[in-house]
């Protein structure tokens, strides 16, 4: 498995000097939360901004994994909002797919902006399938893939578990919608079971290693990274495992990143 880390572990908007140090630790990939590097992630984001960020990453010997935290700075964008919101969400996701492509990335992990609220489960499923079919058609030439991130019940009321994510993927029927797993959500959804991993084997393209509160990996004691890593190895997963941790200290964030790397190396056969 290939070790990566999200840029949410780094200072907002100004962190490119950290990339060589992360490479020296053993990280290979950077997962990009767009709002962590750009104040305007949409219409004010120029191709030169994207190219400069990619260059800084690649000059350090790293590679962009893809994007996550897609709508963090756009709470108005909702999968189950009104017609205007849904249309804008579609446009923004297509835009981010292009950004991901231009960064050299592959995966777009969609977690926020998809609470269904009063929308019934069957209607939400149908609307999500219709939305993703349109989005996947629009982005088919980008070489990117979207993943609905299965989240725990406290974080979302839509796609709580890999079974739901796989059902949507199968109904959409497009090659650029695939599966992702999140360590914390696996625990919260009771999915740390080999059968769950076996069922995801053929379509799993990305893994988030994380903790409650997005703490440094291994600190909470609530996530069995050893077991999750073993189950991933047992299905032959060899892709990126990304440390999804937030910046907890303005002065010690590099040591926190190093601590998380050691967890990836120890339990995910990474590095």
Which residues make up each language-model segment?
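Histidine-acidic metal/acid-base catalytic patches
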Residues: 1-4, 9-26, 51, 58, ...
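N-terminal small/glycine-rich loop or linker at the start of catalytic domains
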Residues: 1-4, 65-79, 112-116
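Active-site acidic/histidine proton-transfer and metal-coordination neighborhood
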Residues: 16-17, 76-178, 188, 255
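Basic, amphipathic N-terminal segments that precede the first structured/catalytic domain
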Residues: 22-25, 29-36
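Short coil-to-beta-strand
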Residues: 27, 60-69, 97-110
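Glycine-rich, proline-tolerant flexible connector loops at the mouths of alpha/beta enzymes
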Residues: 33-57, 112, 116
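Flexible loop residues that form catalytic
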Residues: 35, 72, 113, 212, ...
């Amino acid at each position: 498995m290939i070790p990566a880390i999200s840029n949410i572990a780094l200072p907002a908007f100004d962190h490119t000097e950290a990339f060589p140090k992360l490479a020296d630790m053993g990280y290979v990939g950077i997962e990009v939360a767009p709002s962590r590097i750009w104040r305007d992630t949409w219409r004010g984001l120029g191709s030169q901004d994207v190219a400069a960020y990619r260059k800084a990453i690649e000059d350090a010997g790293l590679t962009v994994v893809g994007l996550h935290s897609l709508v963090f700075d756009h709470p108005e964008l909702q999968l189950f909002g009104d017609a205007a919101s849904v249309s804008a969400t579609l446009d923004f996701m297509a835009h981010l797919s292009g950004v991901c492509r231009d960064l050299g990335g592959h995966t777009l992990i969609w977690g926020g902006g998809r609470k269904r609220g009063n929308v019934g489960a069957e209607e939400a499923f149908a609307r999500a399938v219709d939305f993703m079919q349109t989005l996947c058609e629009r982005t088919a030439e980008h070489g990117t893939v979207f993943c609905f991130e299965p989240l725990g019940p406290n974080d979302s009321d839509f796609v709580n578990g890999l079974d739901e994510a796989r059902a949507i993927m199968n109904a959409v029927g497009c090659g650029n919608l695939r599966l992702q797993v999140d360590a914390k959500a696996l625990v919260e959804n009771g999915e740390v079971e080999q059968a769950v991993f076996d069922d995801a084997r053929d379509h799993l393209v990305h893994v988030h290693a994380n903790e409650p509160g997005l703490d440094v990996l291994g600190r909470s004691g609530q996530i069995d990274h050893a077991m999750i890593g073993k189950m991933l190895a047992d299905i032959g997963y060899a892709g990126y495992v990304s440390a999804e941790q937030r910046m907890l200290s303005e002065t010690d964030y590099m040591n926190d990143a190093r601590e998380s790397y050691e967890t990836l190396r120890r339990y995910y056969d990474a590095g």
